[in-house]
Amino acid sequence: MNIIKSITLLLTLLIVILMTVCSPRESASEVAKKYIDKMNSGDYETAYSLLSKDSKKKISIENLEEFQNILVSTKRIISYKIGKEKIIKKYKHDGKEYKNVVKLEETFNIKNLLYKKDDSLKVNRYFVVENNKYKLLLYESFKKEFGINSMDLAQLKLNDFGLKYFKEVDLILKKAIAINPTDSKLYYAQACNYMNFDGFPGYSDTTYNALDSINKSLKYLDKNDSDYKKNASNIYNLKGVILMFHKRFDEAQQYLNKSLYFNKDNEDPKYNLNTIKKHLN
């Protein structure tokens, strides 16, 4: 009987030891905090070491540094809070399915430099275990946030009018598109900026570039977005405007009418259709 008890106790101890050995020393919450703190302090090498293997295939250390530079140019983090850990048995990230993923919601209190107001930002983070350590699945949220912050920075740059700023915005948007080449809103912003080059010597081809960008914006437009119709209306209106620049008025009218089809309350295509009508008369 004592032998059986001893064996049972030994097995229990072995299980406890194995569980202790197999469990990551740092929790997902601790890794999340370390990532935020290292990014804020500029220790990108350590921050990068916290990414999952798959995330590192899509994101470089230079990308992290560039992300942070854009972030601090558009927002100031006042404080942040990390929510409770939640286990997700199956989670799909960047086309790949992961098991037993830890989800965390991070809440940031920020000062938005573009809109000059305090705001709250919520970000979901997902962690997987690699070599007995929690690693951050970053690519999906990274590319989305990179695009949003890049467009904010572009808007800040455009507070000043001039070729110098248009060229800076062009570079900002091209880098963001390289990170997220299927973001409809980035292509829309790029098309808008290309139109700013009109009239400057040596940039006569930019309106053609704008047409290419607006077509890509249409191609990658998310039909599941709650603002799909509004976004579609704005894109079709801009395409109509670009075609007006090229004096392709019949085509322009078609796209401006499409813009109204998606949003009959959009005043811009109404104005542009009226402009064409006056021009043709």
Where in this protein do the model-derived segments appear?
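Short solvent-exposed beta->alpha transition segments
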Residues: 45-101, 106-108
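Exposed beta-sheet edge and beta->alpha loop/turn motif
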Residues: 88-159, 249
